[in-house]
Every structure is written in C-alpha cells, then in structure tokens.
Amino acid sequence: ANLLEYLICLGFIDLGYSFCHASAFIRKGKTILCPGWRNVGKTNLLLSFLKDGAEFLSDDWVLIDSNGSLFSLPKRINLLHYNYRPNMDTIKKFDPILSVFSDTILQIIEGNKYKYTDLSGTQLKDSLKRRVHFEDLFKRDKVEKSENIDFIFFLNHDNAKDKVSINKCNIKNIKNRMIRILDYEQKPFKLAYDFYKFYTGKSSHLIDSARKINDNVLSEAFRDTSKVFQIDIPDQNQSELIKQHIIRIVGQ
C-alpha cells in the first residue's frame, strides 16, 4: 500500500497537484485543512465534525492544486481501535454487530482483561481495523472538490505539553512541515531510488524534481490563506477540545 501511495503521489505531482497527508472538511461553507501525522487524533477530530453535519473531503490523503482547490480522493476512512469509543453511536447506526464486537474488544483492552482471550493486545487492536466509505458510515454523499482553503490547522504531536494549545503560525513553516511529513513517509523509496541512480547512472527527472514541484504548488495554493494555526497536542485523545478551539476561531 505504501509503495502504491508513493507511485500515486508521483503521478499527481506530474499532473501539477500536491499530495498531502491531511484531513479536510467543509463546515458551514468554510473549508478547513488539518495536516498532521500520527497520534494527533486527526480522524477522531474529523468524525466529530462530520457528526455535526460537516461535509467530508478527506480522512488521510488530499489533493491540492495551485489555485488552492482541494480534491477528495476515493479512499475510505481508516478506523483504528481508538476511533471506536468516541464514535460508538455512529458505528452502531452503521453496523450494530460491529458496535457490539468492538465494545467487547475495547472492554478487554481497557480493563486489561487479557486472561479471557488467547490474543495479545496488539492482535485485539488489529481486529478492530476497518476501512469504511464515508457514504456508508454517514448515509450521505461526500463533496468531490472545494474551491478554496479558508483555514489551516496543523496538528502537532508534542509530548512535552500537558494540554492542548493553539497559536497562529507562519504559512511557510506549515508548508515546509507538510513536505517533510511526505519526505519521511517516502524515505525508503527515495533511498532505493538513490541506490538505483548510483549503481546504474540512470535518473528520473520527475523523482528528482518532485519535491520542488510540490513546494511550488503549495506556495501558490496557500498564497491567499492567512488564517493558519498550529495546534499542539499532548496525545491523540483530545479531539473534542481541539474541536472547541477550531470552532472558536472559525466561528459558530
């Protein structure tokens, strides 16, 4: 899957798009982009807004063009074990059997009752991994495109913090961090390419220029976006508090 995502990323960069690790949604006509990576509660935050009626654009990957338009990709919402408890009401409506199964598994995990099963904690958590279509989970259609980006909230995991904090941020800094996330995720493939180039003397103009193209697309896309913030998060269980901060800034 990671290799496929890398190839898809290169394909879209070749077409002039930026392929970004972020969730995105439209709330009351305002498009909100939430870049972030691992253990920041991105999916729980998204689901919380969707339950309130926000329009879905992306859970994980989003396309951005140089005009600042966001495009939804046909990728399902990825549910992990920590997404179930805060969203059990939604999951129950989607699949009552899954809600009963997940509640039982979570009780074992949360109560440290592993003696009642032969499975390890990791195996129990893995048993709750599901990819579901937004349309199936919420019984409504998603939007395919947003014409602009009104707000950017970069979700930053900071173990040194003991509470959620939010501050205005420089757009150039956010753009660079978004690109670094992609660099990190694609590091194994870029390393393999470097070895290939070294031993064969052959190179790919697209791979060599992909980072620069990505930088240029994001610079153009964000040129009119001034409402940019960083939210520092101590752990991934703060989605409701993060939501309150975002609503305070975006407006009721």
Name each model feature, range by range:
Residues 39:
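Gly/Ser/Thr-rich loops at beta-strand to alpha-helix junctions
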Residues 42:
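Conserved lysine of the Walker
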Residues 45-46:
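Post-Walker A alpha-helix
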